[in-house]
Amino acid sequence: TFAPPFAVINDFQLLASLSPRDKRAGYVEAVKVALIRDRAFFETIERDAEALREFEPVAMQRLIFRCAELHLNHIATSGDPFEFGSARPLDFGHWAAHKLEQLSEYRIRHGEAVAIGIALDVIYSQRAGLIPEATSARILSLLEKLGFELFSNELLHVDAQGRLMILTGLEEFREHLGGELTITLLAEVGRGIEAHEMRVPEVVEAIRELHQRALRRSQPSA
C-alpha cells in the first residue's frame, strides 16, 4: 500500500552518488511546483540556473528544500493526501511524460519526460490564450538552461492508423484519474488552473512547435 510517510530524510551527500543526468532529472519537479504554486521560487531557480547547471551544492540544497516544502504543503493542505479526487496539480506536465517513458521503453528518465511534458503544456497554455508568448519563452528557456532537451522523437511516433501515439496518453490519464480528464495548465507563472479538455489539433501544433525549436537548436550557428 501507499501512504504519506511520517517523515522524509534528505541527505544531500547522497547526491554525490548520482550521475549528472540523474542529478539534473530532479530539477524539473522543482520547476513544475514553482510554476503552479510559487512565482518567487521560479525566479530563484532562474537566478540560480547557471549554478544548478554546474551542480553547485548550495544552489542545489536551496532548490531541494523549497521543492520539498511546496510538495509537502500541497499534500498537507489540499484535503486529498491519498489523491482520491480528480484534481492533481502536482501532475502538471505528466500526462505526456508517462506516455513518453512508455514509448521510449524507459530510455527517457522520468524527469526528462516531465520536462518535455511541461514544455508541451506550456505551449498549449500559450496557444489557448492563457499565458503570453513571452512567458512561454521564459519557461522553455529556463528548462534548456538547466540542461533539458525539450523534444524527443517519441512525440512523433504513430500507430497503424497514423495517429500520434502520444495522444493516447490523454485517454490513459483520464482513466488514471477515474473517468474525468483534469489537466493542469498555466494561468501565469506561479498559478496553475484546471482544464477538463485538451483540443487535439492544438496539442499537435504544440508538438510541431517543440520539434521546430529542437531543429533550430541543433543547427550550427553561423
Predicted stretch roles:
Residues 15-17, 97-98, 191-192:
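Short, acidic Gly/Pro/Ser/Thr-rich loop/turn segments
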Residues 1-3, 56, 81-83, 175-177:
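Solvent-exposed alpha-helices and their adjacent loops that cap or buttress functional pockets
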Residues 1-51:
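A glycine/threonine-rich phosphate-anchoring loop and its flanking beta-alpha core
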